[in-house]
């Protein structure tokens, strides 16, 4: 018979602790244990949650796990895997929808905050354009391309076509460095200068080009390239 949360000592049960102290008081593995609900014949649900996190080396890799990868772990079937992935996806969508509600970008820090949680864990480079109105409110966001940044690939037409369509007053470009190091490359700088020049010609300003690393970023405007 599988171990369940009720089989854990009462003062250690995640559900009871959440009710008495709030969700913020629980550790990552305790929150996952609530989603899993049951353990295995050999271990409690809390122990299973701990093993799951150890296997993926924390929440960050777990966020990108597939159902197949999760079900390779003893004690994690399709139902448990789907429950965890659904919860992680809801968290991502809540964060995204909160930011998208006419988010105002007044400085590089605002822009980085808007995309950081979505982009800092990506395993490939994503080049994103954020379109703003005259009040610097976000009106649209588009992933222009996925792959290594190259001046021959990032064509200004693809960036500014959407800006014209959306009647945007300005645009902020963002891309991530999967290495976690946001230091700009020569290609990053060349692409930025090209986009800024095109923006000046058509009258839609490139406000900035942000490079996202792991919990850090660089503004190419602050570096003098815009």
UniProtKB/Swiss-Prot annotation:
GO terms for biological process: proteolysis. Residues 104-226 form the MPN domain. Keywords: Hydrolase, Metal-binding, Metalloprotease, Protease, Zinc. It comes from the Bacteria. A motif (JAMM motif) lies at residues 175-188. GO terms for molecular function: metal ion binding; metallopeptidase activity. InterPro entries: MPN (IPR037518), RadC_JAB (IPR025657), RuvA_2-like (IPR010994), UPF0758 (IPR001405), UPF0758_CS (IPR020891), UPF0758_N (IPR046778). Zn(2+) binds at residues 175, 177, 188. Pfam families: RadC, UPF0758_N. The keyword Nucleus does not apply. CDD domains: MPN_DUF2466 (cd08071). NCBIfam families: PRK00024.1, radc. Belongs to the UPF0758 family. This is UPF0758 protein GK2618.
